[in-house]
Amino acid sequence: MVWESQESSFYEPFILRGVLGIISADSKISTYSSRTFEDSWKLEEYVLRELSNPEEFKGYILVGDLEGYIHAIDPLTGITVARKKVSRNKITTLISRSDSFYAIDEKMRLFSLSF
């Protein structure tokens, strides 16, 4: 075994710009160097926000939350660089395609976005 984590997650890990990341079941984001597997940064500001799947878009990590916000996070620093409310309902799924990304809320409404 090369690496393991005790984090419990609903989503598969993401790898972006040399960072391996996990969103835990309680919405804490933990990242590790994809080369050495040492801790990189941890982000606890989204704990209990019921984050959606992580999605890569234009070099950022995107996540949706239970209040209908989408957050863009720098994968190298863990700093939230943008945030936008797109729904009054929980964002359940994010999908990125070329120059746009799509968010689906719990009422199955589809939002097409870009930045």
Give, region by region, the residue ranges found by the protein language model:
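Extracytoplasmic/lumenal domain signature
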Residues: 1-115
